[in-house]
Swiss-Prot record:
Subunit structure: Part of the 30S ribosomal subunit.
Protein name: Small ribosomal subunit protein uS12cy
GO molecular-function terms, A-Z: rRNA binding; structural constituent of ribosome
PANTHER family membership: 30S RIBOSOMAL PROTEIN S12 FAMILY MEMBER (PTHR11652)
């Protein structure tokens, strides 16, 4: 416990909270342009798959790596996408997700369950 004299000499420092998605600059989503769409990246040790990711240049000026969720996608080099926060646990350095069903990223084809997460309208 500090004395009054110590508190006068130097005040208490506020706790700085570090954001997990700095490229979004406090916004819920950001628009960006794909600079490169990687066909596949392999995950960390216990898992095995071919995950789809893309390099995206955001309107905030950051160049990030974003995960493309769902089965199949139509993204190419100059596609305009919407990016949200949210990391992929088994891909190091991937801290953002591309929002499906908005801008140039179409929804997942033939999706029946969990449709809102993949930009799919209710089937007739």
């Amino acid at each position: 416990m500090p004395t009054i004299k110590q508190l006068i000499r130097n005040t208490r420092q506020p706790i700085r909270n570090v954001t997990k998605s700095p490229a979004l600059r406090g916004c819920p989503q950001r628009r960006g342009t794909c600079t490169r769409v990687y066909s596949t990246i392999t995950p960390k040790k216990p898992n095995s798959a071919l995950r789809k990711v893309a390099r995206v240049r955001l309107t905030s000026g950051f160049e990030i790596t974003a995960y493309i969720p769902g089965i199949g996608h139509n993204l190419q080099e100059h596609s305009v996408v919407l990016v949200r926060g949210g990391r992929v646990k088994d891909l190091p350095g991937v801290r953002y997700h591309i929002v499906r069903g908005t801008l140039d990223a179409v929804g997942v084809k033939d999706r029946q369950q969990g449709r809102s997460k993949y930009g799919v309208k209710k089937p007739k």
